[in-house]
């Protein structure tokens, strides 16, 4: 969520209005994913991570601060993050398939959206190439 949200706020450069709008949309979708996951964790009798410091420690996909606000850089950072998320959700789907149907369903739904995000970031990269 935060990587897309803050990226939308600081973006500068090529296709900025389009990148900003897409990042805002992705941020909303990522927050929705977090909501689904928190609900599932609670359904399983566990507690979601409460301390943001723990997010960093336990995250398999790392947050990269948008220290360079250039849209090309931001799109690349988000593409890397999407690919990591895709790999993680695929692993979760593989682990849960035929065993935990609800976690599989939620993970598969998130995976589908992450694949869409990846395509949208790749489309921006193709658009940026047009300006060379």
Kindly give the residue locations of the regions a language model identified.
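Iron-associated oxidoreductase/ferritin-like identity signal
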Residues: 1-132
């Amino acid at each position: 969520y935060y990587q897309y949200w803050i990226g939308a706020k600081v973006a500068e450069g090529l296709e900025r209005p389009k990148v900003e709008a897409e990042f805002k949309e992705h941020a909303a979708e990522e927050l929705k994913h977090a909501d689904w996951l928190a609900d599932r964790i609670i359904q399983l009798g566990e507690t979601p991570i409460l301390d943001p410091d723990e997010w960093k420690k336990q995250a398999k996909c790392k947050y990269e601060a948008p220290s360079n606000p250039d849209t090309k850089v931001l799109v690349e950072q988000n593409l890397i993050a999407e690919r990591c998320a895709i790999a993680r959700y695929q692993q979760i789907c593989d682990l849960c398939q035929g065993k935990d149907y609800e976690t599989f369903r939620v993970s598969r739904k998130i995976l589908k959206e992450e694949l869409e995000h990846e395509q949208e970031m790749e489309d921006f990269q193709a658009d940026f190439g047009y300006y060379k």
